[in-house]
Amino acid sequence: MLELNKLYNMDCMQGMKEFPDGFFDLAIVDPPYGIGIDGQKKRVCGNPKHNRKEHIRKSWDKAIPPLEYFRELERVSKAQVIWGGNYFVPYLEQGHKGWLVWDKGQHGLTMSDCELAYTSFDTPTRVFVCNRVELLNDGTIHPTQKPVKLYSWVLSLFARKGMKILDTHAGSGSSLIACYRQGGLDFVGFEIDEDYCRAANERLEQEQARIRLFDLLEQEERKAQATLFTE
C-alpha cells in the first residue's frame, strides 16, 4: 500500500488499486470534464486581468473518465465530492441532493459563472462565493486550478479530524494544501502529468515549510511570554 500524505506521479486507476475497499473516508476529485479547456481562448473579456494565464497545451481534457473510474472511486472511498458532476450524470448514483456550487464572483465572462460538484451526501445544496482572482494569491500553475479556499470550505462541510482524503486528479495540489492547512487529516493525491505533479509538490512543500515556520515562531513566542511571567 502506498504511503499517506504524499502526491504521486501516477495513473489514479493504478494508484487506487493499491488500497482496500473503503480505505478513504472522503474523495474530493476534479476529473477532466471533456470540454477541451486547452482549446478555449485565453482572452475572456475586455479586462486583461481576467484573462487566462498561458499554459502549455497538453490535450488532457478531450474526454471524461470511463465508467470504471467512477466505480473504482466508489470502491475505495466511503463518500465522494466530484467537481464537474453535471458532466458525469450518467455515471453517478442518482437521488442525492447535496450538490455544491462554486460561484466564481465574476459574471458575464465567456467561462461559466459557477461550477457544480456532485456529492454522495443527502444534504442541502450549498453555495460558496470565491472570486477567481483568489487564484492570483495562490499562484496559478494549472488551467483549471481551483482556489485553496474552495477546498477548505468543502473540508469544513464534510471532513473531520482523523479522516483520510483522496484526490485522484490533484492538478495544482490545492486540495492537498487545504488538507494540510486544516490539520488532523491524512491525504493521498495522484497526478498523471509529470510537470503538474512536480509543480504541485513544490507548492505543497512551500506550504508545509510555511506552517512549520509559523508553528516554530508561535512556540518561541510562548516561551518568551512564559519567561516574562517567571521573572
Language-model-detected regions and their locations in the chain:
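Conserved P-loop NTPase mechanochemical-coupling segment
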Residues: 1
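Conserved SAM-binding strand-loop segment of SAM-dependent methyltransferases
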Residues: 4-14, 212-215
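Short, flexible loop segments at the rims of nucleotide/cofactor-binding pockets, characterized by
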Residues: 6, 57-62
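Class I S-adenosyl-L-methionine
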Residues: 18-29, 33, 37-58, 68, ...
